[in-house]
Amino acid sequence: MTDTLFEYDHILMRSEYRTPDIHSHLALHLIVGLGGGLHCTVAGDNFDANAVFIASDILHTAYSDSGEMLVFLFDSTSRYAYEINRRFLHGDSHVCLDSDRVQKIRSLWKAHQDSICNADRAILEYLCLSKNSDLQLDERVAEVLTILKELDEVPDDAVNYLCGRVCLSKSRLSHLFKENPGISLSRYLAWEKMRKGYIHFQRYGNITEAAMRAGFDSPSHFAATCKRMFGISFSEYTKS
């Protein structure tokens, strides 16, 4: 079973999926084993941990023998991601949390598991992760992110559309994205399309409707992108 909270800048899942394929995506992870430890592979390193932060765009997989995990995915352009990089990762591919922090997160989940929203808030507050960081984005990049947030879909001509809205050439806008927040615009658009697909699935409960509304060519394209980005099939994600 998978319980999911969708916020625009992050996702929290209580998952029971097992052995996802090795994959990478633009989100930063926090993965916490609820019923025991995790078996992790990150950037080619195999290790066991109880909880781990994983940087953006790093090949990884993690699973628990019990199957039950808390899985956070933080948008790499968000203030949460900025704080995680600044306070925990320090440029590394991953960092494991100490036992005291893990036990506190587990206890917070147990205390709030009847409300995933309350659990999310309590855990982020405990880790001192705040939206109110001193992250500074180029104003044109910030405008693009706002425009994308307001769109229901990511169209095929999204780059041209965004360039027109912010009065920049393709090369200039792509350069700004690569410079700040440090990711490829085309890859971010693919991530954004995936996110909108999940949002529409939550809203309509139908993969065909979700795929079409998000801008995918077909439901199979949506499902294949899910498998590639997250290492699990869409059917595994939707089991509940």
Regions from the PLM with identified roles:
Residues M1-L89:
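N-terminal regulatory/effector-sensing and dimerization cores
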